[in-house]
Swiss-Prot record:
Disulfide bonds join C31-C96. Keywords: Disulfide bond, Glycoprotein, Immunoglobulin domain, Membrane, Receptor, Transmembrane, Transmembrane helix. Pfam families: C1-set (PF07654). This is T-cell receptor beta chain C region. The keyword Coiled coil does not apply. The chain crosses the membrane at residues 146-168.
Amino acid sequence: EDLANVSAPQVVVFDPSEAEINKTQKATLVCLAKDFYPDHVELSWWVNGKEVHNGVSTDPQPYKQDPKSDHSKYCLSSRLRVSAAFWHNPRNHFRCQVQFFGLTDDDEWTYNSSKPITQNISAHTRGRADCGISSASYQQGVLSATVLYEILLGKATLYAVLVSALVLMAMVKRKDS
């Protein structure tokens, strides 16, 4: 393998989509390791400082980013699926760790860039608090508040008419006496 092409991966974690969470009550985090060469990596998920295997689905092998090139860099993706409730806890910490098997101290490096050594590269995110207000629940709340306001306004108007009628009757009785 060509030492000049050796490069460590860039790692990023993507948060789950709200559409998936609302539809399935599950949350899928996606980890993408890209731009690495050679394809010697191991990917793992860590939740709250502990490695997890349940709910993890990783590509069977890294893929060439440019399949036509002999010296193409590689990419690898992995998914971690958790419950919506677990995702919506901001105390939960999710980390994708990629162990890149690069060069060792014994490998010669004469290029004008930093030596891509064996290293762990991570990306992380935290759970997001669910405020519990979706567009549909907000609209339902506004509709309920409007109906309640109209009922209270109607009730207040009815009481005002009733009190006015009683006052008018009392004034008429007083005149007659």
